């Protein structure tokens, strides 16, 4: 990427990291949507970078919260997530050869749906979800992670409906994101798709991810949750709509 494109990419990384650190998800969607809408890079490239920096974000955020992880939910989510992440990545490889515009439209749909989930205020279930529904949710998140490196929306919506403490929910989500992004990155590396440009862009992004994640702990108490959610919702809707409508008006 050129200098201007790299700066824009890093700006999207900073915005996405701040939102993710406060709300629990949306970093990958903001980066993927912004990069794709602005034409900064191909989907496969952006998704690979997002996976690497999301992995770092999860590691940094889990330093003080890993004790809160609900291991039963985490295990069941991962059981569905890992195989479907691989399936989504394989599907991305197939579709990238001749279905690029379709991938962008599908990304737009995913982003808009995620925006809707972000604004939804689901009432917690009366009891914890069972093993099957947890694995199914992990599978859905894994498929989107494999395709776009950003499958947090269904996982976050599902976990925030559980009758659990919010610290447990956030830590469990972060631990799940860590597995999904690490697994995706490992598969990309083994399959020979990890280029030097992907690594360089990720290395430039990682300091921003670390600094913004640490700063967000001080900023979060002063940011109204509803205001932030509305801002992110509007941003996601605009990004998603631009990706869906672009082929129509070309």
Which residues does each predicted region cover?
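Generic transmembrane alpha-helix signature in multi-pass membrane proteins
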Residues: 31, 60-66, 154-159, 184-194
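Interfacial segments of multi-pass membrane proteins
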Residues: 31-42, 155-168
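Transmembrane helix-bundle signature of multi-pass membrane transporters/permeases
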Residues: 17, 47-54, 173-180, 236
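Transmembrane helix boundary and interhelical junction motifs in multipass membrane proteins
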Residues: 23-31, 147-156
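Membrane-interface alpha-helices at helix entry/exit sites of multi-pass transporters
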Residues: 41-50, 72-73, 163-175
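Hydrophobic alpha-helical transmembrane segments of multi-pass integral membrane proteins
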Residues: 168-188, 199-200
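Juxtamembrane transmembrane-helix boundary motif
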Residues: 1-16, 21, 33-44, 60-142, ...
């Amino acid at each position: 990427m050129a200098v201007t494109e790299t700066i824009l990419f890093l700006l999207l990384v900073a915005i996405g990291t701040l939102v993710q650190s406060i709300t629990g998800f949306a970093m990958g969607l903001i980066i993927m949507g912004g990069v794709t809408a602005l034409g900064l890079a191909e989907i496969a490239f952006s998704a690979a970078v997002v996976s690497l920096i999301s992995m770092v974000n999860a590691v940094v955020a889990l330093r003080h919260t890993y004790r809160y992880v609900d291991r039963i939910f985490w295990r069941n989510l991962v059981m569905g997530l890992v195989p479907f992440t691989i399936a989504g990545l394989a599907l991305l490889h197939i579709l990238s050869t001749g279905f690029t515009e379709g991938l962008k439209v599908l990304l737009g749909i995913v982003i808009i749906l995620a925006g809707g989930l972000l604004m939804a205020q689901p009432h917690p279930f009366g009891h914890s979800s069972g093993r099957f529904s947890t694995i199914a949710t992990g599978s859905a998140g894994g498929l989107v992670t494999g395709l776009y490196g950003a499958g947090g929306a269904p996982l976050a919506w599902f976990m925030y409906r559980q009758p659990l403490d919010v610290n447990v929910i956030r830590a469990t989500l972060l631990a799940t994101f860590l597995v999904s992004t690490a697994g995706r990155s490992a598969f990309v590396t083994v399959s020979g798709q990890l280029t030097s440009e992907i690594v360089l862009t990720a290395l430039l992004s990682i300091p921003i991810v670390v600094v913004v994640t640490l700063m967000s702990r001080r900023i979060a108490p002063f940011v109204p949750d509803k205001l932030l959610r509305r801002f992110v919702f509007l941003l996601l809707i605009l990004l998603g709509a631009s990706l869906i409508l672009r082929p129509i008006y070309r």
